[in-house]
Amino acid sequence: MAKVFVNKRKVITTTSDVVTEEVVTEAVRLHMSKLVKNYIESEDMYLSQHEVLKMAKKDSWKPDNRLVFNYAKYIVDTFTGYQIGVPVKIKHEDENVNEFVADFRKINDMEDSEFELAKMSSVFGHAFIYVYQDEYKQTRATYNSPINMFIVHDNSIEERPLFAVRYTFNENNQEGIGQVITNDELIDATFTTFGMVSFGERTQHIYNSIPVVGLIENEERQCIFESVKTLINALNKAASEKANDVDYFADAYLKVLGVELQEEDASQIRENRIFNLWKNGDGALPEVAFLEKPSSDTTQENLISLLK
């Protein structure tokens, strides 16, 4: 029976409070296989790397426009601006507390961090604040995306956080580094792309609880544009095909029926843009026209209007 499972993109374990390499390995593998792909898809959409740009290329002689309507970024930036465009203000009746909070927020540039956390939470559905001590023993805080960090919860009714994992890989490297973060210690660890975890040095921390806090966009931990991803992709495809049709008609082939053109005749027509054709005896009247495929302009416009 699996010791770790996912419920609403929350990683949960059925084991005790003991953090072992076996449990962490299972959690990392689950994170890699079940969650990371969707996070990267959401990040790509926010960064304008949409599905239409990744489709197979068409033949070189065919129009191949790739248009992106980045409604994902528009939705996230608009919502984040409304949510936290005005920075958070924190006050306390005790002046000493006010001073401490002001210093902490200044050192950690919390206005920027809070904005990035709000944006990140909208893109991924949730995000994390990680608190740590720097080399000067000052308490610092930074933000982390769920692509390389997650919290494992117990399976009690409260789903209490048991430990957090933070890991990263260098490009084209099969081995990564990171930490396993518990209530009382930081465990250095190595990670493989297959999800194997090996513990290293252990260091006690001062917080008496996991110094990682999750911020959620909604209970389901869905990104803010999750429900319209398919509509955005369909709009990109429809607009790209419409642009392809415009290019097709601009480069349409000319057909000339009922008269034999020599090479110099064709060249003269192209340069002067004039046709001077006449009926030759009892033969058919010469015909000049562009080759056209059936137009789907109205259908495409209706589809684009519907998707918008």
Language model features by range: what are they?
Residues 7, 91, 132, 144, ...:
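A structural detector for beta-sheet-dominated domains
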